[in-house]
Curated annotation (Swiss-Prot):
Alphabetized InterPro entries for the sequence: G6P_Isomerase, G6P_Isomerase_C, Phosphoglucose_isomerase_CS, SIS_dom_sf, SIS_PGI_1, SIS_PGI_2
Active-site residues, record numbering mapped to chain: E351, H382, K509
Pathway: Carbohydrate biosynthesis; gluconeogenesis; Carbohydrate degradation; glycolysis; D-glyceraldehyde 3-phosphate and glycerone phosphate from D-glucose: step 2/4
This protein's encoding gene: pgi
Entry EC number(s): 5.3.1.9
Name under which the protein is recorded: Glucose-6-phosphate isomerase
Source organism of the structure: Coxiella burnetii (strain CbuG_Q212)
Top-level class of the enzyme under EC nomenclature: isomerase
Family: Belongs to the GPI family.
CDD domains xref list: SIS_PGI_1, SIS_PGI_2
């Protein structure tokens, strides 16, 4: 029986018909304790999901659907290393990377031992650099760490580093290079001293074109200063699942950190892919980062579905995507330090859930995934919230706020006030009675107020979740990221798709090689469609290679 034919799914269709014409204002008016009932705390996070177009029966039916999809079994597979891809290879065992309680998994004990060995190696390097004992080619201590990677090899470490800057030990600084455009590289190193700069090359296969090209630029940049190749070897580290390729590139074996094949890039910040972060904030704080994620893992694994934060977050997303036909979801963090979080979550959701084939190879017959995007509040309020408030689409929003940015900072009350004000407005709207009252109180005549009111109405009934943490620290950040990882995994289970591959992006890479040859006037263009051929010829014309 397919997902859409299951009894809970059919019941959800009827529930949608019942609720689609109702307004959330009425839910709150009829239930004064709705905000209390539809909220929970776990792993240092407070989650309010009361501003959603659901009642308790909806939640029950969504949970029944999850059970019908064997979610309990699939959760245990996630934590036991029993998930495999179409080739039978283990995937999705990233939860082992933050197993901090010295507990041995029932299977894959070798993997756990390798992880613990990696922890020790990361810890030792972190201490050496932070204490100034790791030297460059002129015997000066390292001050700048440049992470070269792309996708998950860059988005995760950069996001986490920016979020945890108050925990970075001066004078250490981290920088991140990912783009093939050489502007990214040269603008990053422009103010750096090659004598005190360490490059971390992160690539699972060590064949990623963008990463290797930037690594080559780093080699040339260091050689201009050091003059001798043997002098720059201490300025390179590699994180990869292909250590032999890293060694062939010129990285010393002792400077190569393992990234296992069963760790996907977008789930790799917990591994040595987070080496730059571990060095910057120190091993103890990095371990707190892992502990926070592990706390969310434990909650996800143990809590009942209707009290399970990742599961509820996933089920609500499915509710809007598959029944309200929402095409997009927004993430709005109210903290400058989380400026890269929307980009990180965009990749996590869209690479994982952008699939149209089920696990058995058959076609998917229901919508999967959505466009996930966002920006910082309050900036976003002056940018695109207008579409949320007075547009015509249903756009679910996740608001994320911290009461304090760090132990030393003041309470973020103005930010919290704006965050809560946006969520309330999205829910209740601004009806004509309220608009008219406020306009008349401003001294505007009734007739003019009638005309103005039409343009100021806000329909409301737009759903949102609010996630609040007391403080933005390594533990809370780890918990938050694990929350969204598990949310995405639950969605993939219910949709019966593989969240751990991204084959779609490979075809474009392959075609880029052929197109580059054509742009270099080395091949004919008969294999390209007329549009691509025309574009190639236009570029060649501008270059002067064509009349």
């Amino acid at each position: 029986m397919s997902l859409v034919e299951s009894p809970p799914w059919q019941a959800l269709k009827s529930k949608y018909q019942e609720l689609s014409s109702l307004h959330m204002r009425d839910f709150f008016a009829q239930d004064k304790k709705r905000g209390t009932r539809l909220s929970l705390e776990a792993a240092g996070l407070y989650f309010d999901y009361s501003k959603n177009r659901v009642d308790e029966k909806t939640i029950d039916l969504l949970c029944e659907s999850a059970n019908a999809c064997n979610l309990p079994l699939r959760i245990e597979q996630l934590f036991s290393g029993k998930l495999t891809n179409e080739s039978g290879e283990m995937v999705g065992f990233h939860t082992a990377l933050r197993q901090v309680n010295n507990f041995s998994f029932k299977t894959n004990n070798n993997a756990i031992q390798e992880i613990h060995a990696s922890w020790e190696k990361i810890k030792k390097l972190s201490i050496r650099i932070r204490e100034g004992d790791y030297k460059g080619f002129t015997n000066k201590s390292i001050t700048d760490i440049v992470n070269i990677g792309i996708g998950g090899s860059s988005l995760g470490p950069q996001m986490a580093y920016n979020a945890l800057k108050p925990y970075v030990k001066a004078p250490l600084r981290c920088h991140f290079i990912s783009n093939l455009d050489d502007t990214d590289f040269y603008e990053t190193v422009r103010t750096l001293n090659p004598e005190t700069t360490l490059f971390i090359i992160t690539s699972k296969t060590f064949t990623t074109k963008e990463t290797l090209e930037n690594a080559r630029r780093a080699t040339e940049w260091l050689m201009q200063a050091a003059k001798k190749e043997n002098l720059i070897q201490t300025h390179f580290m590699a994180v990869t699942a292909a250590p032999e390729k890293a060694h062939e590139f010129g990285i010393q074996k002792d400077n190569i950190f393992m990234l296992w094949p069963w760790v996907g890039g977008r789930f790799s910040v917990w591994s040595a892919a987070g080496l730059s972060l571990a060095i910057a904030i120190g091993w103890e704080e990095f371990f707190e980062f892992l502990r926070g994620a592990h706390a969310m893992d434990t909650h996800f694994r143990q809590a009942e579905f209707n009290k399970n934060m990742p599961i509820l977050l996933a089920l609500l997303s499915i509710w809007y995507i598959n029944f309200f036909h929402a095409k997009t979801q927004a993430i709005i963090p109210y903290s400058q330090r989380l400026v890269y979080l929307p980009d990180y979550l965009t990749q996590l959701h869209m690479e994982s859930l952008g699939k149209s084939v089920q696990l058995d190879g058959s076609a998917v017959h229901w919508q999967t995934g959505a466009v996930v995007w966002g920006d910082l509040g309050t900036n976003s309020q002056h940018s695109f919230h207008q579409l949320f408030l007075q547009g015509t689409m249903v756009i679910p929003v996740d608001f994320i706020a911290f009461l304090k940015n760090s132990r030393e900072s003041h309470w973020q009350l103005p930010l919290i006030a704006n965050c809560l004000g946006q969520s309330q407005t999205l829910m209740e709207g601004y009806d004509k009675e309220g608009v008219m009252r406020d306009l008349i109180n401003q001294g505007i005549e009734h007739e003019k107020a009638e005309k103005l009111a039409t343009y100021r109405l806000i329909r409301g009934n737009n759903p949102s979740n609010t996630i609040i943490l007391e403080e933005l620290n390594p533990y809370s950040l780890g918990s938050l990221l694990a929350l969204y990882e598990h949310k995405v995994y639950v969605q993939s289970v219910i949709w019966n798709i593989n969240p751990f591959d991204q084959w779609g992006v490979e075809r474009g890479k392959h075609l880029a090689k052929d197109i580059l040859q054509a742009l270099q006037a080395e091949t004919d263009q008969s294999s390209f469609d007329s549009s691509t051929e025309r574009l190639i010829n236009y570029v060649l014309k501008i270059k002067g290679n064509r009349p």
